[in-house]
Each structure stands twice: as structure tokens, then as C-alpha cells.
Amino acid sequence: MHINSKDNPRVKLFRKLLSSKKAREEHGLFAVEGARNCVDTAYEAVCGRIKVHSVFYTQTALTKYKNTLKTDSLFSCTRPEDVFEISDELAKKMTDEGNSQGIYMIVFKVDLPFVAEYIDKNGKYLVLDNLQDPGNLGTLLRTADAVGVSGVVMTCLLY
């Protein structure tokens, strides 16, 4: 199917998911953009690890990234009625990025549980939460290794 309007509900949803954490939490969805990211996402969907809500692509992107894109998995990772061709002009309006690659997805969030079986009850762990300066991560990891911690647990905003 073809979408031409920025007022299309799915295009509006994509833009909202891209810019709003609240929207991502409310809808249980997140936005993916770029050829490589979408190929990786399609692979995960074909393997059954995630579920794709919608795919958007331009003909220009299919031509430009033909060596990167595996169009069979890109188009088979969701139902055919959820795959949309869009114009180059609309692609530029879907993202705030200056150089749109013309490939986008809306994907259902996956809740990943904390796996307690990997934690040694007698171990010492460094827990990093809300790390403000990722540049400090290397120093923290080297220090943790030097003092013999069993592992590092890091939190992050996945979506």
C-alpha cells in the first residue's frame, strides 16, 4: 500500500513514538529508523523474538541500500497490509534527521526480565543506574575489574 500524507494515522504515530517517551509507554510501541537498524529488526521479527507493527520504505531507499536490505525479510516480518511505500518527501517529514534513509518501522516493545540466575549470591556487583557521562564507563569498568567485582549491572532506557 502507498501512503502520501503526513496526516496518515500511522505516520503520525511514528512521529509521536520517535519524539515522546510517554507515547512509547502508552502504546507499547517504539520507532526504528535507518537501513541497518530496520534490517536487524526484521531479522529479529522473522526469528520470532519481536513483533513488527508497521514498515515504511521509499523506492529510493530500496535502490540505494539494495546491498544492505534483505527485502524478503523486510517485507515478510509483518503482515502485507502493514507494509507501506512512502514518497521521499514524506520520508523527510517522518524524522528530524537531516538525511533520512527512507526506511522506518514501528515495533512492539518487548519486556526483558532481569535474569537472577546469572547473579552469584555471594558475589560483589557494581550497579550503574542513570549514568550521566558514558565517558566514565571505561574507568568504572576497569576499577570494578581491579577490585574483583563479579559483574556489572547497568540500567538504560531501552525505548
Predicted segments with their positions:
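N-terminal positively charged helical leader segments and presequences
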Residues: M1-I103
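Glycine- and other small-residue-rich loops at beta-strand/loop junctions that grip anionic moieties
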Residues: I3, F30, D129-N130, T155-C156
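Amphipathic alpha-helical repeat scaffolds
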Residues: G34, Q132-L140
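Hydrophobic residues within beta-strands of alpha/beta enzymes
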Residues: V55, V152-V153
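Acidic/glycine-rich phosphate/pyrophosphate-binding loops and surrounding catalytic core
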Residues: D96-N99, I103-K121
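Conserved small/polar residues in nucleotide/adenosyl-binding loops
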Residues: Y159
